[in-house]
Amino acid sequence: EAPANAVTMDDPTAQALKYHPSAADSDRVAAARPGLPPEEQHCANCNFMQADVGEGDYKGCQLFPGKLINVNGWCASWTLKAG
């Protein structure tokens, strides 16, 4: 069950960034970013995810202030987490 402040696919920012809460169902292969093979790209290993915000499968993201993203999701701004 997604929290009330989870990013939805009809969110304008989500649409602009091609965000999908399920990376497997996203455009990550066609719009793959450098750093990892497309099938390994998801929010949990993205530099923008805020691991200390939210809980469970829903965490904060610098690109969606005040909202939570699914750690299994993907968007076109995916950037490999440093370290």
UniProtKB/Swiss-Prot annotation:
Q: Which InterPro entries match?
A: High_potential_FeS_prot (IPR000170), HIPIP_sf (IPR036369)
Primary localization class, coarse: periplasm
Q: Known SUPFAM superfamilies for this protein?
A: HIPIP (high potential iron protein)
State the Gene Ontology terms under molecular function: 4 iron, 4 sulfur cluster binding; electron transfer activity; metal ion binding
Q: Gene3D superfamilies, alphabetically?
A: High potential iron-sulphur protein
Q: Mind listing the UniProt keywords for this protein, alphabetically?
A: 4Fe-4S, Electron transport, Iron, Iron-sulfur, Metal-binding, Periplasm, Transport
* Pfam families (UniProt xref): HIPIP
Q: Where does [4Fe-4S] cluster bind?
A: 43, 46, 61, 75
Cellular component GO terms, alphabetically?
Answer: periplasmic space
- What is an annotated GO biological process for this record, any one? aerobic electron transport chain
Q: Where in the cell is it found?
A: Periplasm
* Keyword flag Iron: yes
Query: Which purpose does this protein serve, as stated in its record?
Result: Specific class of high-redox-potential 4Fe-4S ferredoxins. Functions in anaerobic electron transport in most purple and in some other photosynthetic bacteria and in at least one genus (Paracoccus) of halophilic, denitrifying bacteria.
Instruction: Report quaternary structure and partners.
Output: Homodimer.
What the record says about family reads: Belongs to the high-potential iron-sulfur protein (HiPIP) family.
This protein is called what? Answer: High-potential iron-sulfur protein
| Organism lineage string | Bacteria, Pseudomonadati, Pseudomonadota, Gammaproteobacteria, Chromatiales
